[in-house]
Amino acid sequence: MRRLKKIKVPRMIKKPFSQAEMEHLRCNAECQRDIAIMAFLYSTAARIGEVVRLNRKDIDWGNKEVIIYGEKGKKERRVYLTDDCAYHLHKYLLSRDDTNPALFVSNKKPHTRLGKQAIQSMLRTLGQKTEIHAHPHKFRRTLLTDAGNRGIPLQEIQMYAGHQKPDTTMMYVTVSEENVRASFRRYIA
């Protein structure tokens, strides 16, 4: 029996959002909840399954942090809220008139906990409206890439993302050509 050669499939580099795309999405969001969700996804780099399980009480407003209970491996990790995220999340929570403990709920009564599909659908609709390919995991990729490009060590990014292996983190971090050029000039040229 002959062995078949493995076909090499070129790996597509998945691009993060640009700052302009993030702002365009925010400006076209339907409501405060949607802005808060996008800010939260970016700030925490949380997986969508982790976000939909969160409750209001999980937010530590004093330290602007959240303990995420991971769906992968059931481990927990601490993530932080940017000032922008804390502002939009607080504004959203103040606008709610329900008693549901869930962090994110539907806009219409009876205000049920949002599921993965609801957030994915909201982002897909917003993406079609703005002509930007938008999905929850792209916010995670964007934050991890931004962290790498701003000089945060890979080991710290790995810990923040909840990855077991640095290789996994490296698949998320897209190094900018500008940073490569600057490093070359600083250390080599």
Residue ranges, per PLM feature:
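Conserved catalytic core of the tyrosine transesterase superfamily
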Residues: 1-189
